UniProtKB/Swiss-Prot annotation:
<comment type="function">
    <text>Catalyzes the hydrolysis of L-fucono-1,5-lactone to L-fuconate. Can also hydrolyze L-fucono-1,4-lactone, L-galactono-1,4-lactone D-arabinono-1,4-lactone and L-xylono-1,4-lactone.</text>
</comment>
<protein>
    <recommendedName>
        <fullName>L-fucono-1,5-lactonase</fullName>
        <ecNumber>3.1.1.120</ecNumber>
    </recommendedName>
</protein>
<dbReference type="InterPro" id="IPR052350">
    <property type="entry name" value="Metallo-dep_Lactonases"/>
</dbReference>
<dbReference type="Pfam" id="PF04909">
    <property type="entry name" value="Amidohydro_2"/>
</dbReference>
<dbReference type="GO" id="GO:0016787">
    <property type="term" value="F:hydrolase activity"/>
</dbReference>
<dbReference type="InterPro" id="IPR032466">
    <property type="entry name" value="Metal_Hydrolase"/>
</dbReference>
<dbReference type="InterPro" id="IPR006680">
    <property type="entry name" value="Amidohydro-rel"/>
</dbReference>
<keyword id="KW-0119">Carbohydrate metabolism</keyword>
<comment type="similarity">
    <text>Belongs to the metallo-dependent hydrolases superfamily.</text>
</comment>
<keyword id="KW-0378">Hydrolase</keyword>
């Protein structure tokens, strides 16, 4: 099964999607499953993992309802308040939602880089692990030092780094530090990495495929091709590339260097991680 391990749906309104910038008009509209079904079908994608875009229980419920209607959705990564005293009760209420695979918090949007190290947040993550839910770690590269500290406390939890931790591909600044942190994180065998979100960290209008090769080299070398999964980050990727383009960037790289692991990167790893 060919899997896109990272995409979003939303009913757009400016209040709830304030992270969408003034010059990002392509994202200022509704994105529902039928639009992605057409893209997926044209590019041989059999299923997707839809990931939260708003930090609300209501959105998580909405994504679960979409998964009941659209077989393309194989897994849901929702949002829950990890520091809420009623977290356990909320997780218990979802126990029969088999398509709900894990959760994500928009850590990249937290002004305090140590937000993820708060004891209550860490305890919430540990409770997710007890319920056998995965966790998507959405951070900027500058937050990698804190992420390393966090991951040291979660040696068994299935965790995936979203968007290769968002290095500054456009300028190339900070590459050495990003590389060192990613190599250290990859030593945790429970941690995976999504090859996703790269085009929007590059120069939107004039990126070249070669821009991404040093970053993919680091990720594949550090994590190995059995802990890396492809994600399109559709529709956000459309700020810089088409759906087939983001697939081709990774596909050509894998075909050239890891041809025997193509099915892993484009499906098997996501199936194993999310238990699709």
């Amino acid at each position: 099964m060919r899997i896109d391990a990272h995409q979003h749906f939303w009913a757009y309104n400016p209040e709830e999607f304030d992270w969408i910038g003034e010059d990002e008009g392509v994202l200022k509209r509704d994105y529902f499953p039928p639009a992605l079904e057409a893209e997926a079908g044209a590019n041989g994608v059999d299923g997707t993992v839809v990931v939260q875009a708003r930090q609300s229980i209501e959105e998580t419920q909405w994504l679960l309802s979409l998964a009941q209607q659209f077989p393309l959705i194989k897994g849901v990564v929702g949002w829950v308040d990890l520091m809420n005293p009623s977290l356990e009760q909320q997780l218990l209420s979802w126990q029969n939602e088999q398509v709900l695979k894990g959760f994500r918090h928009v850590l990249q949007g937290e002004p305090d880089p140590n937000f993820m190290l708060q004891p209550r947040f860490v305890e919430g993550l540990k409770l997710l692990h007890q319920f056998d839910y995965t966790y998507d770690l959405l951070i900027f590269a500058a937050q990698l030092p804190q992420a390393r500290q966090l991951l040291d406390t979660l040696p068994q939890h299935r965790i995936v780094i979203d968007h290769i931790a968002k290095p500054d591909i456009a300028s190339g600044e900070g590459f050495a530090q990003w590389k060192a942190h990613m190599q250290a994180i990859a030593e945790h065998q429970n941690v995976y990495c999504k090859i996703s979100g790269m085009v929007t960290e590059a120069s939107h209008k004039d990126w070249q495929e070669a821009d991404f090769i040093p970053y993919m080299d680091v990720v594949f070398s550090a994590f190995g091709p059995e802990r890396v999964m492809f994600g399109s980050d559709w529709p956000v990727c459309q700020l810089a590339a088409t759906y087939p383009e983001v697939i081709q960037i990774v596909e050509r790289y894998v075909t050239r260097l890891y041809p025997e692991f193509s099915q892993h990167v484009f499906g098997l790893n996501a199936e194993r991680f999310y238990r699709l």
